[in-house]
């Protein structure tokens, strides 16, 4: 049910309960009206749990139910069933209002001002410049991109940030391999995307390291040269990083992932040191005998030690900083630059402890005062035989996964579409729909095993199925537009009397509350489930009902408007889930 109908009923019951309390001289601190969906649709459209009101008022359930029924029976069909009141909404007016609202609001249907311009930073992706994005990155990216759209849809002001890790030991590994084996070759000459080109050298380094004991020493020498800003080392580093970043940005473009600002770690990693030194001056941290600057962290509940705290080094005795220190600097920069209210880090579950420590230290040093910091931890995406390892080259590569899915469905598409470029575009859209939906439909915290066959299903709980239903509805609307049927100026929505039409109207009207729930829970899977439910209900409806009937143009006109509302709702969901909408399939 729409928010307005629920709100109206809630307000009316609130007044009834308040008056009942006054008549019995009962003082009320708070009235909690619990609105639910009945377990079966034939029981009603809205269910009110009276048990909680009974506890609050200290009155029998029957007494409260009788008072509410007496006050509302003129407007609604309402029946008591144990501790519940089941209410049926007047259908005709509701169907008319819902369809007109959806078709008038179009792309904005389902949006709200729930978060009322709250300024939220979403940091996601954060790739390394030594390899291409793997499917784990694709999961991170689609979670970040989808959540940014969902939070915007409920009124938040979203800033999407990406911190690219372009320095450190892992970057030096690709650099060393290129110096030894690259022979001045370029991605263009090798006919490879820049990130894949660099990734090959990262894998090559690990093979080299297995056969050469001094490989680690060579890496440390190269890292020292970088830190000392050796000209030839910096030149090589910039060249390789540019190639990698160019390739990564191509993947972002393909997957419809964008950012408001991209930071390079090499440009800001020193800022954290100054933040820690300020903390040292204020007495928030301390200097150890060897010169290292430390802070005490609280112990986790499962840690056993003689002390109540554990020591955390923020700046090493040689003056270098750790990742946590660099992240402290990033928080300070973003507060100054954006003055956000909340910052959400979309990062894998392996970093839970890091963020726990980061948020504690940030608060203790007074950096993030009055700011909410949150780690949205997501599970891993695994191969059939376990977790991915890029150093061995045993990884589900993001670009190659997209290409693999495209190649799987291209033969079928080329049978329908002769133009090769159009066929490839359709194949890409279906591949992205398959991947994005599959990566979003599970609970974020869960590890998943990517199942190619399941992701590409045109009949199951999948992106291509949602895309197919959208394209099917569009083809019906296009067919209607080609027919010589008189235009009906005043649509008679009272003709929509089929039970499945009512079921679908109820689902359509719940879009806003589902978007709000997805935003509150930071959980796009709420919208994958919602989209699948709507698509399934339409498919069942279409099997039973003849939409276009030239012998009944009034009913046809009403059903066409009904289908427009279904399609608009599906399209709005697809946008929020970063799934391409397709006119034809």
Curated annotation (Swiss-Prot):
Instruction: Quote one Gene Ontology molecular function term.
Output: ATP binding
Subcellular localization is given as: Cytoplasm
CC annotations in GO: cytoplasm
GO biological process annotations for this chain's record?
Answer: arginyl-tRNA aminoacylation
Alphabetical keyword list: Aminoacyl-tRNA synthetase, ATP-binding, Cytoplasm, Ligase, Nucleotide-binding, Protein biosynthesis
Swiss-Prot/TrEMBL catalytic activity: tRNA(Arg) + L-arginine + ATP = L-arginyl-tRNA(Arg) + AMP + diphosphate
- Please tell me where this protein is predominantly located: cytoplasm
Q: What Enzyme Commission number(s) appear in the record?
A: 6.1.1.19
HAMAP family associated with the record: Arg_tRNA_synth
Q: How does it assemble?
A: Monomer.
Tell me the protein family, please. Belongs to the class-I aminoacyl-tRNA synthetase family.
Q: PANTHER family from the entry? A: ARGININE--TRNA LIGASE, CYTOPLASMIC (PTHR11956:SF5), ARGINYL-TRNA SYNTHETASE (PTHR11956)
- Name this protein carries in UniProt: Arginine--tRNA ligase
């Amino acid at each position: 049910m729409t928010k307005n109908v629920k709100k109206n009923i809630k307000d009316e019951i609130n007044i009834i309960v308040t008056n009942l309390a006054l008549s019995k001289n009962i003082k009320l601190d708070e009235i909690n009206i619990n609105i639910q969906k009945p377990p079966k649709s034939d029981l009603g459209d809205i269910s009110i749990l009276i048990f909680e009101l009974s506890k609050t008022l200290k009155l029998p359930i029957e007494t409260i139910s009788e008072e509410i029924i007496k006050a509302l029976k003129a407007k609604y069909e309402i029946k008591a069933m144990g501790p519940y009141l089941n209410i049926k909404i007047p259908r005709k007016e509701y169907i008319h209002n819902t369809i007109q609202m959806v078709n008038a609001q179009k792309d904005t249907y389902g949006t709200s001002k729930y978060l009322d311009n709250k300024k939220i930073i979403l940091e996601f992706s954060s790739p390394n410049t030594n390899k291409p994005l793997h499917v784990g990155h694709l999961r991170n990216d689609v979670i970040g991109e989808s959540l940014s759209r969902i939070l915007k849809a409920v009124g938040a002001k979203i800033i999407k940030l990406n911190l690219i890790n372009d320095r450190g030991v892992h970057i030096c590994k690709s650099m060393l391999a290129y110096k030894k084996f690259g022979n001045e070759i370029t991605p263009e000459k090798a006919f490879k995307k820049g990130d894949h080109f660099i990734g090959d050298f990262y894998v090559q380094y690990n093979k080299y390291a297995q056969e050469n004991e001094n490989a680690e020493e060579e890496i440390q020498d190269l890292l020292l040269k970088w830190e000392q800003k050796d000209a030839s080392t910096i030149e090589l580093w910039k060249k390789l990083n540019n190639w990698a970043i160019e390739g990564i940005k191509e993947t972002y473009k393909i997957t419809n992932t964008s950012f408001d600002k991209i930071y390079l770690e090499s440009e800001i990693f020193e800022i954290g040191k100054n933040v820690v030194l300020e903390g040292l001056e204020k007495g928030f941290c301390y200097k150890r005998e060897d010169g290292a600057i430390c802070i005490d962290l609280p112990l986790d509940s499962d840690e056993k030690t003689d002390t109540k705290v554990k020591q955390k080094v923020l700046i090493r005795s040689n003056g270098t900083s750790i990742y946590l220190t660099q992240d402290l600097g990033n928080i300070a920069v973003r507060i100054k630059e954006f003055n956000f209210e909340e910052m959400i880090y979309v990062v894998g579950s392996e970093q839970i402890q890091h963020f726990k420590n980061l948020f504690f230290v940030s608060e203790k040093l007074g950096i993030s005062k009055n700011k909410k910091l949150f780690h949205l931890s997501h599970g891993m995406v695994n191969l059939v035989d376990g977790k991915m390892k890029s150093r061995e080259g045993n990884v589900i590569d993001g670009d190659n996964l997209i290409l693999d899915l495209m190649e799987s469905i291209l033969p079928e598409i080329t049978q329908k579409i002769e133009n090769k470029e159009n066929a490839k575009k359709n194949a890409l859209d279906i591949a992205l729909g398959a991947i994005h939906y599959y990566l979003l439909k599970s609970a974020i915290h869960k590890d998943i095993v990517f199942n190619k066959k399941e992701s590409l299903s045109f009949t199951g709980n999948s992106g291509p199925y949602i895309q197919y239903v959208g394209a099917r509805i569009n083809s019906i609307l296009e067919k209607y537009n080609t027919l010589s049927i008189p235009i009906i100026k005043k649509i008679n929505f009272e003709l929509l009397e089929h039970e499945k039409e009512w079921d679908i109207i109820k689902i359509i009207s719940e879009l806003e509350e589902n978007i709000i729930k997805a935003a509150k829970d930071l959980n796009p899977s709420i919208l994958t489930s919602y989209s699948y439910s709507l698509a399934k209900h339409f498919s069942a409806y279409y099997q039973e009902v003849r939409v276009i009937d030239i012998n009944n143009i009034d009913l046809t006109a009403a059903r066409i408007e009904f289908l427009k509302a279904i399609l608009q709702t599906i399209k709005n969901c697809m946008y929020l889930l970063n799934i391409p909408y397709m006119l034809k399939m």
